[in-house]
Amino acid sequence: MRSLVSYIASCVQRCRYGALLVVMCFRAVVVFAQYDAAFMRYWQVEPMLNPAAVGRQEELNVCVALQTHATGYEDAGSTLYAGADMAFAIGRTRHGVGLTLVNDEIGLFSHKRFSAQYAYHHPLWGGKLAAGAQVDMLSESVDGGKAQTNDANDPVFSGGDMSGSQFDASVGLFYTHRRWYAGLAMQHLTAPTISLGDKSELKVNSAYNFMAGYNIPTKYSFITLTPSILVRYDGTDVRADLTARIKYDGEGRKLYGGVNYAPQYSIGAFFGFVFHGLDICYGYEANTNGLGISAGNHEVTLGYKVELNLGKRGRNAHKSVRWL
């Protein structure tokens, strides 16, 4: 099995442009041209993309997603997302809060983001408009000791471990109607610069996300078609994910599946079901450039919803099996 770390290190060693190039190089190799990780099932991790999505649904929403990178490479690493959000009322006003954690690791490189989120929801035009904001803590690290190079004194890796952190912020809007939704967010509002050791730094560009989806009923009440789109732009690269889902909800069963296409990036498919309130989904995303189709990403997501009756005595929370 080929080592992804060795492959990246050999490329960087020939260039010798320092730690910043290392970070940029490894993200390009695994087809993450942008700073933030990309999940194929992006509608499940909406709070990661837009803080205004927290509290969009009535229940406490918990989600864990794991994506492995570059199948066939032993140092490829993975991306983990964990998030929870909930809605609550103060008088006649509705609000949402959430917490998210992203841990993205590939070989000797590690990226972490912890976010605290808030959104205000207001009825508008037969739907609900939410305005949200979040505070982030970004952390980057490079473990130079894991690099396998031909030159033990290579200046790129001779410094050993390099790490740094910085505060950041994001804002967003999200509109939800009966059959459709749309959201727009600006991430990395402060465009922070993260210092890695004494001589290197990583500049994080502001990024813009737009997502939308529509539930299309069919002549069969138990089948729904849901096309959706996510467009991300960081000032340099554009990535658009186009998704088609079909959902079955009948005879006590909830099943769904679909395909996702990101032009110039990847094509993928997924299948999921709801079992005793737990939403379980598996997908495979094949790269259409970079490392190639065979070195794709496996993705597993788990979601769970719990109805909360805050402030109402004598009633216990119980699970919900509504669609995620």
Q: What are these model-derived regions, one by one?
A:
Residues M1-D36, E307-L324:
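Cleavable N-terminal export/targeting peptides
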